[in-house]
Amino acid sequence: MTPTRKINPLMKLINHSFIDLPTPSNISAWWNFGSLLGACLILQITTGLFLAMHYSPDASTAFSSIAHITRDVNYGWIIRYLHANGASMFFICLFLHIGRGLYYGSFLYLETWNIGIILLLTTMATAFMGYVLPWGQMSFWGATVITNLLSAIPYIGTDLVQWVWGGYSVDSPTLTRFFTFHFILPFIITALTTLHLLFLHETGSNNPLGITSHSDKITFHPYYTIKDILGLFLFLLILMTLTLFSPGLLGDPDNYTLANPLNTPPHIKPEWYFLFAYTILRSIPNKLGGVLALLLSILILTAIPVLHTSKQQSMMFRPLSQLLYWLLATDLLILTWIGGQPVSYPFITIGQMASVLYFTTILILMPIASLIENKMLEWT
């Protein structure tokens, strides 16, 4: 008799996606981050829903409503810090997931890759708006600085900024609309994730060797469900350790001070996961140039499939490309570090050098290294 999971229309959908899904037998722990991102999304929506029940999106009451959640609501403190640190874990998983895609050549699955980039941009927008909601000093000034970047757009810039603000400065209307978008975007992310999976299952998963694995596939369940559950437990261990022992570690102390438009913090900076892009923005003295560089630092991912000149999909057997890949990873860590430092010598120079290296590695060095490796293959 045929199992119900193969007959029932709804269960059949789940079955084809998570149970009987043919999966390459050799995918490593780097393939765990997709399911971890799904877990992060569920965690963020759940905790966010409970926070929204007690939050007040108004400039006069937002900060005190956060204090009320933390002090008076049953387990409000853990819900709040799980949501804040859950966002950090979300981005760690996201960066590692993208890093794996770059290393093993998953970007050649164009539809999946492009939807992934849209997902990244949507997640970044959601996180930015969420950071504004507690209405602390860094929330207010972060929102002011980042939304002000729109004024770099010629002719319509100033009008656009005032339109986004809902007035002549960041105030209650800005907070209300940011809360609205912060609430709706995770559901849009969920829909995009479904599309991401749909396109992925059209081609099947990539594998570390970067070769077709049709002749050697196994069912997703029980092999990879067990592997994913192990990954989930390790993820929860790190998240709970962070949340229970050092909840404010990744945040900014300035955000525990109520927003004050008359007092600018000495060093305005976004959350740690945006610092690499923030450094690239600051490295260019021209405002419009900085904004374009900021956008390109993310949108450059769309060019990766075009810049792929190697005859091999994966970097597993390409030592030169591996060297440049880890150079790029180190460069991103340097950019992140510089973003958290004040705008003074030597940090400005280091930031500019790291920014140039970031674009040079992706646009010039990696394609050249791939061509050299192709030649080396011919010599052997």
Swiss-Prot record:
Cofactor: heme b
Pfam family, one: Cytochrome_B
Binding site for heme b b562: H83, H182
TM helices/strands, residue ranges: 33-53, 77-98, 113-133, 178-198, 226-246, 288-308, 320-340, 347-367
GO cellular component, one term: respiratory chain complex III
Alphabetized GO MF terms: metal ion binding; ubiquinol-cytochrome-c reductase activity
Record membrane topology: Multi-pass membrane protein
Heme found in the keyword field: yes
GO biological process: mitochondrial electron transport, ubiquinol to cytochrome c
The keyword Heme is assigned to this record: yes
Chief location category: mitochondrion
Alphabetized UniProt keyword annotations: Electron transport, Heme, Iron, Membrane, Metal-binding, Mitochondrion, Mitochondrion inner membrane, Respiratory chain, Transmembrane, Transmembrane helix, Transport, Ubiquinone
Additional facts recorded: Heme 1 (or BL or b562) is low-potential and absorbs at about 562 nm, and heme 2 (or BH or b566) is high-potential and absorbs at about 566 nm.
Protein name: Cytochrome b
Species of provenance: Pan troglodytes (Chimpanzee)
Phylogenetic placement of the source organism: Eukaryota, Metazoa, Chordata, Craniata, Vertebrata
